[in-house]
Regions:
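A generic structural signal for well-ordered alpha-helical segments
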Residues: 38, 110, 210-211, 252
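Active-site neighborhood of glycoside hydrolase catalytic domains
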Residues: 130-135, 141-241, 245-250
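Feature activates predominantly on carbohydrate-active enzymes
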Residues: 1-152, 161-163, 167-182
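A general structural signal for short secondary-structure junctions and capping/turn motifs
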Residues: 8, 109, 232-235, 252
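Residues within well-ordered alpha-helices
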Residues: 34, 106, 206, 251-252
């Protein structure tokens, strides 16, 4: 005889995990295994953090002859094939990266089992895999509250040509459909320590740019990175997904 009814359903619509494959390379086979295990446990969103660098750049500070560019010696990774290159050297890591074909297929395969893959390209900070190749686009200075930490992992978004350059990185994957129109694209936006006005203007521009074709996600930072004058456009934030990782950086 029936003794009751079990109703089993998730409490939250987005059940996510962020996997940093940038600072330490992770094979595609392992990524697939993680996605399958997540799906088994009713998780449905795997955010793949594709680029970053070792965070403690103050470890690369020379007491006798301090120079922000010393921090370029720190390890960085960019794990997705890219046509963006300088003098024949791509921003994609030579030691290990995924081809566009295999990553695009990974997105499609996971979608069939109810798992959304969210590729994250972290800009304008955490970007030394990019600035290490395009050093002329880096912020050459020190973190305001830490005079020993270099800012060379920051792209200098005070310059229009750098903002345009960043767009080309995303556009490549959108135009060749590595990221199709259903792919949520994460633009990073994490922990920018340089010019707050330039950061907020950049967020208005990059969010609106990506939203022309794709849903967009970003790390919360707009509460902390302020200049008391540059408003974030309603059309930039409407519908954008935010990783609320710290109330100090974004309070919702």
């Amino acid at each position: 005889m029936p003794r009751g009814e079990i109703r089993d359903y998730p409490k939250y619509a987005v059940r996510s995990f962020v996997f940093d494959v940038a600072r330490k390379a992770v094979s595609m086979d392992m990524l697939k295994d993680v996605a399958k295990n997540m799906a088994w446990y009713k998780m449905n969103d795997l955010q793949v953090h594709l680029n970053d660098n070792l965070i403690f750049l103050e470890d690369y500070y020379d007491e006798d002859d301090p120079d922000p560019t010393d921090a370029f010696a720190a390890y960085s990774g960019y794990r997705l094939e890219s046509d963006v290159a300088k003098d024949g050297t791509s921003i994609a890591s030579a030691d290990y990266h995924y081809t566009k074909e295999e990553f695009g297929s990974f997105i499609q395969e996971c979608r069939k089992m109810g798992m959304n893959i969210v590729p994250e390209i972290d800009v304008p900070a955490h970007a030394m895999a990019i600035t290490g190749i395009f050093r002329e686009y880096a912020v050459n200075g020190w973190t305001p509250n830490n005079s020993r930490r270099s800012l060379v992992d920051h792209l200098d978004v005070t310059r229009p040509e750098v903002v345009a350059f960043i767009k080309t990185i995303f556009d490549e994957y959108i135009e060749d459909r590595t990221f199709d129109e259903n792919t949520v694209i994460h633009v990073g936006a994490d922990e920018f320590m340089a010019d707050a006005t330039a950061y907020r203007e950049f967020m208005n521009e990059i969010l609106c740019h990506i939203k022309q074709t794709n849903p967009v996600r970003l790390w919360g930072g707009l509460t902390r990175i302020v200049d008391n004058k540059t408003e974030i456009l309603p059309e930039a934030v409407k519908g954008s997904q935010i990783n609320l990782w710290s109330k100090d950086w974004a309070d919702g």
